[in-house]
UniProtKB/Swiss-Prot annotation:
Belongs to the class I-like SAM-binding methyltransferase superfamily. rRNA adenine N(6)-methyltransferase family. RsmA subfamily. PROSITE patterns: RRNA_A_DIMETH, SAM_RNA_A_N6_MT. Specifically dimethylates two adjacent adenosines (A1518 and A1519) in the loop of a conserved hairpin near the 3'-end of 16S rRNA in the 30S particle. May play a critical role in biogenesis of 30S subunits. Pfam families: RrnaAD. One of its GO terms (molecular function) is RNA binding. Its main location: cytoplasm. Its EC number is 2.1.1.182. This is Ribosomal RNA small subunit methyltransferase A. InterPro entries: KsgA/Erm, rRNA_Ade_diMease-like_C, rRNA_Ade_Mease_Trfase_CS, rRNA_Ade_methylase_Trfase_N, rRNA_adenine_dimethylase, SAM-dependent_MTases_sf. It is found in: Cytoplasm.
């Protein structure tokens, strides 16, 4: 039986064997604690009927734990230097496929279709590189992929934002974007000491359960997100000020914006971070009708 990859000794051995040096630009921090990996897989509720997409497998620490429980694992790895290492470390598992590609440029829908046709459900489970966390998650959500959910390790601060509630310090446009598509919950905080090299920040694992239909009904989701970004433009400004300053031709549409706020029963003196997703949806539908 092979020793688990995610132990300090085995990780050190593997890195030494291949003369691997970390690339800061790729946000490479490898986990060296199998208990934490097991808990991540538990939170993802992976079974022998699950197809798993992993992003940034590193030397295969999480991949290995997923492969033990999932029907199939397909992992995207951008760093060519890791391919021979993964080939070696994951050789005992015949249910793993490695794709050498940047996931942001990949047709993930096609990969799901081709690799997971015989799986009952598809999950994304990953220890994400911190510098591209948000673009990766938003890509997965916006592409309306047939996912049951996403369980990922990321910077704690970003996890806090994704799961934040209105009027909290962390609540922003990312909170609403993520909660529009999913139910978000931070399930674990992970200290920096369980990584090599140690990151500068603490991490957290967030579980995003994909909703069957979005949290709110909006006429035009592109305008809905534009309105949200505008509302959070300058945090200390009122909603009315932010909308005038940040929506295209906002100042010219002052009267229309004022009337829309009134119709939606929202006080323009409030700040964007005090509005719930339902209030944003109401305002978006009224304002979109008035402007277009």
């Amino acid at each position: 039986m092979n020793k688990d990859i995610a132990t300090p000794i085995r990780t050190k051995e593997i890195l030494k064997k291949y003369g691997f040096s970390f690339k800061k630009s790729l946000g490479q921090n490898f986990l060296i604690d199998t208990n934490i990996l097991d808990r991540i897989v538990d939170h993802a509720e992976v079974t022998d009927e699950t197809g798993v997409i992993e992003i940034g497998p590193g030397i295969g620490a999480l991949t290995e734990q997923l492969a033990k429980r999932a029907k199939k694992v397909t992992a995207f790895e951008i760093d060519q230097r890791l391919l021979p290492i993964l080939n070696d470390t994951l050789s005992p598992y015949d249910n793993v496929t490695i794709i050498h590609q940047d996931v942001l440029k990949a047709d993930v829908g096609k990969v799901i279709e081709e690799n997971f046709a015989d799986c009952k459900e598809v999950m994304v489970v990953a220890n994400l590189p911190y510098y591209v966390t948000t673009p990766i998650i938003m890509k997965l959500l916006e592409e309306n992929l047939p996912l049951k959910g996403i369980v990922v390790m990321l910077q704690k601060e970003v996890a806090d934002r994704m799961a934040a509630i209105p009027s909290s310090k962390e609540y922003n446009s990312l909170s609403i974007a993520v909660q529009y598509y999913t139910e978000a919950k931070t399930v674990m905080v992970v200290p920096k000491t369980v990584f090599v090299p140690q990151p500068n920040v603490d991490s957290a694992v967030i579980k995003l359960t994909v909703r069957e239909t979005p949290a709110v009904s909006v006429e035009n989701d592109e305008f809905f997100f534009q309105l949200i970004r505008a509302s959070f433009g300058q945090r200390r400004k009122t909603l009315m000020n932010n909308l005038m300053n940040n929506l295209p031709d906002g100042k010219q549409h002052k009267a229309i914006i004022e009337e829309a706020l009134q119709t939606a029963d929202i006080d323009g003196k409030r700040r964007g971070e005090s509005l719930s997703i339902e209030e944003f949806a109401r305002l978006s539908n009224v304002l979109q009708k008035a402007l277009f």
